[in-house]
């Protein structure tokens, strides 16, 4: 179990960290800008939430396989490696981070940003000194939800990464494997770990959201 747990936590943490830069960029664009193609980006971001995870995994398999456009371009194997696990987790958890961060950015009073601009601050400085700190709690909540989603990812992972013990067998895949083998006791033990991690992540995320909406007293 420890090997499965360590692999799952490492890949989920890496996937969460890797989606932060593009996730925040997408969330900020959706929250603060009106531009041609915005609705297309909104749709693309939401797709992994509504598509069957296995369908997403099949798309990744075709893209990342040795005969796929991305696979041919890369000089190393991706499919059926821990890299495929990370990519599947990234794709499936990306929408949660974007949606949560977008709400956090939208709740930042634009007057603060405008005031900083009138004082000569650049867009980058406004973002890093005004927008980002004020939206930080919501962003952290989004990261926690994305991490929890990555921990529970199964459909896309099993298709693009498979079930290779010690290399691609994550917590969700291990639960499925134990059930298939009739080892229900082990499956329920793994299930308990998965539920505990998910509960802790969601509870903490909700705590950040609640604190963000609490009135501040001087």
What do these predicted ranges mean?
Residues 36, 122-123:
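Short coil/turn motifs that cap or connect alpha-helices
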Residues 119-121, 133:
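Glycine/proline-centered hinge or cleavage motifs at structural transition points of membrane proteins
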Residues 49, 110, 162:
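Short, conserved catalytic or interaction motifs in soluble domains
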Residues 1-106, 130-155, 178, 187-210:
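Membrane-water interface segments at the C-terminal ends of transmembrane alpha-helices
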Residues 209-218:
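Short cytosolic juxtamembrane segments of multi-pass membrane proteins
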Residues 116:
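The alpha-helix within a helix-turn-helix
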Residues 61-62, 156-182:
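Glycine-rich helix-loop "coupling/hinge" segments at transmembrane-helix boundaries
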Residues 102-113, 123:
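Membrane-helix/interface signature in polytopic inner-membrane proteins
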